Amino acid sequence: MITKKNEQDNDIYILGSDVQKEREKITAKRMWIALFICLVIMILAVIFVIFSSKEQTPEYYFEPEEMLQQSISIITANDENQNQKGYIKMQEETINDVPLLLYIPHKATMSLSLGVPDKSDSTIIFTTMAADIRRDNKKIVGDFVLSGKQLSRGTAKKGFCAVIDKTISIGMGEDTPLLQQAVENNGFFFRQYPLVHNGQLIENKPKNKSIRRALAVRNEQVIMVESKNIESFHDFSQALIDIGVSDAIYLVGGDAYGWYRNEELVLQEFGKEKTDFPENTSFIVWQIK
């Protein structure tokens, strides 16, 4: 016979069993939720590793390959009649109302010099200023190599020209193996604004207008180009592309001094000759051997 006390004890026992079962259900549910969250985290981690490794691949592998394609190289003074004298052919071309002067070297090789070249040296058939110098300390702007000696460092201007033996390379980029090759092979190297790279116009910050000059590649030949009128960087670069230039870097413009010798070897000057050039003034020099 069940007494009231036994009934109460039994009620209490049954109530305790229900609570225990409920707690077990809650615990199991929490475990499943925790396992699900862990699974989601693991999946997300795997996805992150896969995609992050893909994004880093260009920096690790493709960048060096791209760097090797950043310049164009032209061998000079190798395809002409050996009995013909070297000279500069000057011709005018106008494209989209932008008149240009083209200086085309024949039977000559290019190098660099510090200081104004000797005007009386008849073997020099073209010269004009190459790298910029700082206004405050008169030092050369950017990497500069003269006969294998690196006289200046820096990449403020991304365009470059390297001359190694008879090969002229024009390109664009902060890093290039051609810099070290110029040092190791008694070569030449300087930096300037890039104007055209692989047929594409390169924008530059200066927005003023001036007489513009460029060292350029057209039809696998290195030429110098000068604007007859004052032009912006953009319009000058576009004109270079329009006449078929594939790659070009800037040469000092404005009234920068220089000269060339025509087919009769008559000296023709341009710009303004100063009585006192800063000692770090650099020139490209085309010379016949």
What role is predicted for each listed range?
Residues 128-129, 134-200:
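Active-site-adjacent helix-turn-beta-strand microarchitecture at beta-sheet edges
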Residues 56-57, 188, 246:
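Pepsin/retropepsin-fold aspartyl endopeptidases
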Residues 138-155, 208, 217, 221-246, ...:
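Conserved, well-ordered active-site substructure
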Residues 2-153:
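Zymogen propeptides
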Residues 96-98, 165-167, 217-223:
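Beta-strand-turn-beta hairpins that frame and shape the catalytic cleft
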Residues 91, 160, 214:
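Short, surface-exposed charged micro-motifs
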Residues 199-209:
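A general structural motif
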